[in-house]
């Protein structure tokens, strides 16, 4: 029980570590004379670096028995990268900071998922990961609210200090998790039938990486999420830039407001996600997230005003909150028994990161040339590709996403060649 509470505390504090000053980066650079296109491209550079690092990071999490140390190193590197950003505002120094933040952040997601699976096993993963995400979104709310107030009261420097403080607290939290609380074979999904009282077979062999390519539902999930994030990732920073450019809000305070609203909704969505999955299954829950984004784009284009942040970010919170629980849990179920669960998490995150990396450049260029409303409409239109894909392969995906997971697991096992 102590280990689980420490795990939830880690998820709370690591929320601000994963992205560094991420959401505040746009207004921070805008205040120093950067244009929307420059901001978009430098964020894309970081996104591409994170995309390239995510799959290797997942493989590393599967292979290592030092997952706690991996989180500590990632936290330290993120703090150093944020310090570099504060010291220098030159294009390539900022780009280097974003690359470092993205690479280290890429390791944290699979590491947290693997640690959770290793501690509570398959039968307890959905519930515990839901609790983790509630803590994570709660951490984002607190960090954003404090960052907004500190930035307004003391300037952007205080935002960097707060990020470093959260980094130190995340190190304390991960150090509080007992080393023997994590079964590293179970953590990579090597024991499909593990229960709370049955240890995994030591050194259980992992099936080949081809299982990832031969799991059609996994590839469809990744492709749909890639299209979703191509439209989604740029909306928050662009909406903040649009409001600030229209002189509708103070940069730090408004950026914090956008984050707090979304994260509060994410807390509620994450709390409901496990119940919705049990009631309707993964397919319907993920479909709901895809439906929310085009509507969000239309509202963002129509209401560039301070009060518009409420519907725009509430819809973001619904989509992100449900996905934060449903997607990792579905990947665990699809690859149960393969021994490559965290590689699978990394593959899905890589495709998501590809869409997210291209989104700021696409949105920034469109906003620079055609204005913010056109950019929001275009991003919302792009995201409908995820909806089309999810519906077109509905029969296959509904079968694989069934809440009992049996069909999906059998499909993966049938596709798994001997290593």
Predicted regions and their residues:
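Symmetry-related core transmembrane helices of the 12-TM Major Facilitator Superfamily/SLC fold
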Residues: 158-175, 376-392
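Loop-to-transmembrane helix entry
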Residues: 35-45, 247-264, 343-346
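Helix-loop boundary and gating motifs at the non-cytosolic
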Residues: 1-47, 219-220, 224, 229-244, ...
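Cytoplasmic helix-loop-helix junction between adjacent transmembrane helices
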Residues: 99-136
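Juxtamembrane intracellular "pre-TM" segments in multi-pass secondary transporters
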Residues: 1, 180-221, 411-415
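Structural signature of the two symmetry-related core transmembrane helices
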Residues: 69-83, 164, 284-298
């Amino acid at each position: 029980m102590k280990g689980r509470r420490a795990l939830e505390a880690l998820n709370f504090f690591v929320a601000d570590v994963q992205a560094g000053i991420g959401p505040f980066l746009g207004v921070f650079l805008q205040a120093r004379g950067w244009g929307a296109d420059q901001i978009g491209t430098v964020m894309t550079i970081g996104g591409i670096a994170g995309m390239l690092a995510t799959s290797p990071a997942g493989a590393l999490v599967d292979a290592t028995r030092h997952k706690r140390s991996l989180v500590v190193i990632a936290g330290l590197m993120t703090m150093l990268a944020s310090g570099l950003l504060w010291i220098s505002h030159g294009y390539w120094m900022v780009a280097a900071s974003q690359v470092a933040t993205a690479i280290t952040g890429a390791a944290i997601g699979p590491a947290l998922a693997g640690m959770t699976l290793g501690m509570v096993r398959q039968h307890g993963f959905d519930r515990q990961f839901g609790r983790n995400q509630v803590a994570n979104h709660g951490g984002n709310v607190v960090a954003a609210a404090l960052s907004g107030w500190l930035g307004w009261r003391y300037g952007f420097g205080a935002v960097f200090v707060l990020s470093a403080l959260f980094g130190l607290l995340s190190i304390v939290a991960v150090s509080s998790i007992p080393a023997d609380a994590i079964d590293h074979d179970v953590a990579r999904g090597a024991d499909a039938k593990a229960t709370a009282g049955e240890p995994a077979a030591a050194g259980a062999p992992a099936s080949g990486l081809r299982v990832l390519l031969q799991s059609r539902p996994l590839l469809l999930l990744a492709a749909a999420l890639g299209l979703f994030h191509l439209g989604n990732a740029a909306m928050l920073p662009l909406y903040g830039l649009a409001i600030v450019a229209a002189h509708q809000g103070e940069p730090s305070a408004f950026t914090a407001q956008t984050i707090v609203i979304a994260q509060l909704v994410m807390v509620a969505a994450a709390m409901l996600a496990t119940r919705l999955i049990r009631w309707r299954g993964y397919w319907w829950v993920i479909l709901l997230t895809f439906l929310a984004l085009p509507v969000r784009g239309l509202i963002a284009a129509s209401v560039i005003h301070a009060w518009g942040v409420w519907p725009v970010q509430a819809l973001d919170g619904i989509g992100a909150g449900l996905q934060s629980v449903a997607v990792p849990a579905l990947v665990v179920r699809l690859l149960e028994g393969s021994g490559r669960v965290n590689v699978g998490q990394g593959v899905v995150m890589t495709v998501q990161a590809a869409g997210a990396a291209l989104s700021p450049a696409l949105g920034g260029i469109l906003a620079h040339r055609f204005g913010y409303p056109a950019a929001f409409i275009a991003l919302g239109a792009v995201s409908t590709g995820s909806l089309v894909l999810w519906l077109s392969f509905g029969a296959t995906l509904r079968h694989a996403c069934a809440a009992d997971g049996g069909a999906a697991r059998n499909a993966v096992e049938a596709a798994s060649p001997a290593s």
